[in-house]
């Protein structure tokens, strides 16, 4: 009997253990089903709050299934996209001089023109406080379906629009649908997305009578109307969903200034003109004041970026007197200093931007600043240099040729401006 009791006792214990294990398994399966079922119900949007100065890894946000919608009301950690450094990028550019040769201006097609080094292509911009995703051409086009862009300004604006078109052409080739008489203003269309990109030539953003040839040689001083905006861009402005507006370098040219249809002074004019030299900073301040006020008061629903002027890297001279740029890789901040003229231009731009934001308040909320000056200051290696012309040293390796240390090779550093712009559009980061 004793043995029989022990057997029954053991059996009861085993039965108890089996029931316990089974109950545990059922509970785990039910929990997993709950998490899986409801975790898949909708994307999770992560909001990061707290101390904005703390080091937090970038927020991963799952977007809606509708890829054409730009996410709104998504909080991500603050990050100054314009303060950082260039780091090695083994992947290199997303397009090549060959894949986008038809869009690129011949003067910026450095590799085709014979530039012997290619190391300048293998760098990318890394902000100090966050990661910056690689430009996603497909994502950009999906977001821009049925929308219109314009990049407005001088030849650097043209340089930038060509960069953007080349990056987007990895998904779909743009079709040129318009050009002006001198082929300076153009428009392209991406048919599959009904997306248009315009490049508007307006180097001063205000009305100007310019007397120079295709090589930039002037036969007379520019007649600049500081208080009259150039309708080449203002007429198009109300229809735009996005615009990048810039100016700067052209204000350094010799010019006569007009306000209220009367000459009021000049810059760089001869003493015999009997006019007061007001300085280019006066003209730039006055013009930008009218530009910024127009944008802020326009009540546009589009997103308008104002890009600061970008410094050149001429050494031992300038464009017209033998300046060169021979560096082949980025430099540290401590190794380069912005030129005085570039500082003056940038100061005017920052001051006018801050003024209009302060004065207009919410009326200026769609106006954003793109301050790429510091970012590109450390890339003296990214210019065509002597390779603005096709194979300039083939006939004479010691030939004296004009260098371009202002514009940017394509592909090249200017492509990474688009990384920053897409991050601002998608995640709402405004930089500073």
From Swiss-Prot:
The gene is TBL23. It is found in: Membrane. It is a single-pass type II membrane protein. GO terms for molecular function: O-acetyltransferase activity. The chain crosses the membrane at residues 13-35. GO terms for cellular component: Golgi medial cisterna; membrane. The keyword Membrane applies. A motif (DCXHWCLPGXXDXWN motif) lies at residues 404-418. A motif (GDS motif) lies at residues 153-155. The lineage of its organism: Eukaryota, Viridiplantae, Streptophyta, Embryophyta, Tracheophyta. This is Protein trichome birefringence-like 23. It comes from Arabidopsis thaliana. The keyword Membrane applies.
């Amino acid at each position: 009997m004793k043995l029989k009791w022990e057997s029954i006792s053991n059996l009861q214990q085993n039965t108890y253990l089996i029931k316990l294990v089974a109950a545990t398994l059922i509970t785990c399966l039910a929990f997993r089903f709950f998490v899986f079922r409801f975790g898949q119900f909708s994307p999770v949007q992560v909001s990061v709050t707290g101390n904005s100065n703390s080091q937090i890894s970038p927020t991963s946000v799952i977007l809606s299934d509708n890829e054409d919608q730009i996410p709104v009301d998504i909080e991500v950690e603050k990050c100054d996209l314009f303060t950082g450094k260039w780091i090695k990028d083994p992947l290199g550019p997303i397009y090549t001089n060959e894949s986008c040769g038809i869009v690129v201006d011949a003067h910026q097609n450095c590799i085709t023109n014979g530039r012997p080094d290619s190391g300048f292509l293998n760098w990318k911009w890394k902000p100090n406080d966050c990661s910056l995703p690689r430009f996603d051409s497909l994502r950009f086009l999906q977001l821009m379906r049925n929308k219109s862009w314009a990049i407005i300004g001088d030849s650097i604006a043209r340089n930038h629009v060509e960069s953007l078109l080349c990056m987007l052409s990895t998904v779909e080739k743009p079709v040129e649908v318009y050009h002006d008489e001198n082929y300076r203003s153009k428009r392209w269309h991406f048919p599959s997305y009904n997306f248009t990109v315009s490049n508007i030539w307006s180097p001063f953003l205000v009305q100007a009578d310019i007397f120079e040839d295709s090589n930039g040689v002037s036969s007379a001083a520019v007649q600049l109307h500081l208080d009259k905006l150039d309708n080449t861009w203002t007429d198009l402005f109300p229809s735009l969903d996005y615009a990048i507006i810039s100016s700067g370098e052209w204000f350094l040219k010799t010019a006569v200034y007009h306000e209220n249809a009367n000459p009021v002074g000049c810059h760089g004019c001869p003493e015999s003109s009997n006019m007061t030299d007001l300085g280019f900073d006066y003209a730039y301040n006055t013009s930008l004041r009218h530009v910024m006020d127009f944008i802020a008061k326009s009540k546009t629903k589009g997103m308008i970026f104002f890009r600061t002027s970008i410094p050149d890297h001429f050494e031992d001279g300038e464009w017209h007197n033998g300046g060169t740029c021979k560096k082949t890789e980025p430099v540290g901040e401590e190794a380069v200093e912005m030129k005085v003229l570039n500082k003056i231009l940038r100061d005017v731009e920052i001051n006018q931007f801050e003024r209009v934001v302060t004065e207009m308040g919410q009326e200026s909320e769609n106006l954003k600043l793109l301050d790429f000056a510091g970012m590109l200051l450390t890339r003296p290696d990214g210019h065509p240099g002597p390779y603005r012309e096709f194979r300039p040293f083939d006939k004479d390796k010691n030939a004296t040729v004009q260098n371009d240390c202002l514009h940017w090779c394509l592909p090249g550093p200017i492509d990474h401006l688009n990384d920053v712009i897409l991050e601002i559009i998608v995640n709402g980061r405004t930089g500073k």
